[in-house]
Amino acid sequence: MTDDTVPEIDTVEALDAREALNVKALTPFQMARRRYFHHKGALVSTVIMGVLLVVVIFAPLTARYGINQQVLDISAGKNQYLSPRKVAWMGSDQIGRDLFSRLIWGIRTSLFIGVASAILSVIIGTTVGAVAGLRGGWFDDVMMRVTDLFLAFPFIVIIIIMRAFLGAVPWITGIIGDVSSIRFIIALFAIFGWMGVARLVRGQVLALKEREFIEAARAVGASNTRIVMSHLLPNSIGPILIALTLSVIGAIVGESTLSFFGLGPQPGANAVSLGQLVELSSEGAKQGNWWMVVYPCGALVLLAICINFIGDGMRDAVDSKLDIGG
């Protein structure tokens, strides 16, 4: 006689194991995306920057007026220092130009300066830092002493000094443009903005190059170039992304600071930068025209906050040790 009255009962451990088998493993990219989306500040900042990029990229369509177009013909009445209204959403400046339209064009120019100079400085700094950390010796000593020398002074002070020095050398200005050109400012920030990135990457390489997987790569005959490109840099991507976002912010704020002192780029009659608008805001503030201060400076602060949050989100995304739960 068989006993068929006792049902088969799954233990908790068996159920957990069965459930684990049914869960599809996430790829590294999916895990990084999940961690990034879990960072609320980065998510909101990404949306804001996405909208802002669409607006500035399509500036010819989104700007209500041309860069130097006046909101009203002077014969139709006063057009200088108009407060925000229907004809000028953010008011007008000292010669009647629409501040909203000029802000769109200015953010476009400043983002170009920031992104271009940041990419160049990160490329230079990553290359120097990786080579110095991996090879060591005299090259490492020389590069770190140069880095220490430049990092000993405030960045903006170095930029002002080197702007005057490089601008006086004809063959240099023949290559990278006049001191008032956007190309010169981008080159200036790139040439003297890589030191912090180099120190950061060097530290990462020094921490990684004695690890077992690097020793294994050397054992199978991998070259230094392959070790750097396939192992060291991929494992240093988090700090590099943080350095990139900070470099973008630094270049945008640096350009605005130079413009405030009258040393910024002069994009030309058909262009404007955010730094120029910040420079003009001081004149508006003296006359009590608050909109000339609030909107350009507010845009500068918004850019800095959003880019910083995006950098934080990227850092979390590549941090495999970060546990965000189910």
Go through each PLM region and give its residues.
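Generic hydrophobic transmembrane alpha-helix motif, especially the helices
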Residues: W89, D93, L99, L120-G125, ...
